[in-house]
């Protein structure tokens, strides 16, 4: 990741709404087996990155709800002021999520990257209602092989300078599949603060450093609660994750007190495992986990 500073430019406030507001409003798919899966996309990502998993699970009979996180699709000048609590509430208070929670059937929650942490917060707050949780490439720390500079900018994230700093996404963009990576690169390499028309499909090409600070606050909040969590949990991550090392999954696995817990590693993917080369395996492992949990942990 490279870093961009915008001191004195205030470029983001001059963006045209027609070029910066491009929404993927999320989606809901009705199923027939009485169970619901809530999918949470990653920070600066889009519900589109969860669509393959959603379609797979829906074909297995699950109702699937995938909200758009708060302020995703807005300009970076809006997104950079978003608190992690707003992101969380945009999931918890989503109409279809509330409908599922008010029902009687099993409710599972799965999240990608920072979305995995929001899934854990939901499982902790609604422990009596959440049947199981899946964490896909959970991101507590940016310590992957393609994010060597992230730790050096954490001190910046704790100062007002954070409002003027952005990480620029760089290859491989969390994706090992060359065809998908090429499509993302075509968009990201030509994107600027003024032109982000494909945010709804590919997510933001820039990552506000303010959100690095929000991640720190979220991790601080969640770390105090992991040791009391007993909800069945599944963690899936690529061994070669370019954004976050497998230490992230191990950190969670070692602290939760769930009787049913499993950690699965992939060997031909990078960070965004919901769309990468082993997405079929991810979908199968998720559905198998949900089925076992509904069956009392038995295969």
Protein language model regions, located:
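Catalytic nucleophile-loop/oxyanion-hole region of alpha/beta-hydrolase
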Residues: 74-108
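Short alpha-helix in the alpha/beta-hydrolase fold that links the catalytic acid
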Residues: 53, 231, 245-254
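Alpha/beta-hydrolase-fold enzymes
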Residues: 114, 121, 125-205
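Short beta-strand/loop motif that positions the catalytic acidic residue
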Residues: 229, 235-237, 241
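Active-site nucleophile elbow and catalytic-triad environment of alpha/beta-hydrolase enzymes
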Residues: 22-24, 207-225
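Catalytic active-site module of serine/aspartate enzymes centered on a nucleophile-bearing elbow/loop
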Residues: 262-299
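Conserved alpha/beta-hydrolase
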Residues: 54-76
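Acidic catalytic loop of the alpha/beta-hydrolase fold
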Residues: 240-244, 272
């Amino acid at each position: 990741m490279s870093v961009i500073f915008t001191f004195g430019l205030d470029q983001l406030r001059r963006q045209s709404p027609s070029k910066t507001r491009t929404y993927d409003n999320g989606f809901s798919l009705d199923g027939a087996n009485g169970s619901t899966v809530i999918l949470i996309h990653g920070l600066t990502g889009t519900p589109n990155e969860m669509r393959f998993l959603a379609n797979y699970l829906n074909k297995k009979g699950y109702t699937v709800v995938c909200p758009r996180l708060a302020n995703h699709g807005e300009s970076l000048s809006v997104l950079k002021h978003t608190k992690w609590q707003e992101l969380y509430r945009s999931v918890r208070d989503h109409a279809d999520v509330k409908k599922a929670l008010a029902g009687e059937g099993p409710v599972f929650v799965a999240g990608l990257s920072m979305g995995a942490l929001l899934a854990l917060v939901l499982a902790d707050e609604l422990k009596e209602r959440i049947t199981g949780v899946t964490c896909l490439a959970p991101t507590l720390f940016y310590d992957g092989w393609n994010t060597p500079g992230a730790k050096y900018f954490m001190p910046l994230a704790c100062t007002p300078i954070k409002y003027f700093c952005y990480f620029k996404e760089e290859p491989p963009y969390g994706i090992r599949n060359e065809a998908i990576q090429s499509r993302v690169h075509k968009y990201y390499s030509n994107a600027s603060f003024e032109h982000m028309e494909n945010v709804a499909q590919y997510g933001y090409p820039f990552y506000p450093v303010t959100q690095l600070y929000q991640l720190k606050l979220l991790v601080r909040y969640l770390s105090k609660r992991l040791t009391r969590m007993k909800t069945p949990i599944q963690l899936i991550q690529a061994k070669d994750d370019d954004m976050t090392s497998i230490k992230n999954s191990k950190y969670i696995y070692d602290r939760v007190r769930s009787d049913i817990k499993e950690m699965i590693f992939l060997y031909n993917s990078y960070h965004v495992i919901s769309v990468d080369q082993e997405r079929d395996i991810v979908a199968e492992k998720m559905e198998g986990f949900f089925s076992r949990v509904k069956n009392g942990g038995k295969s």
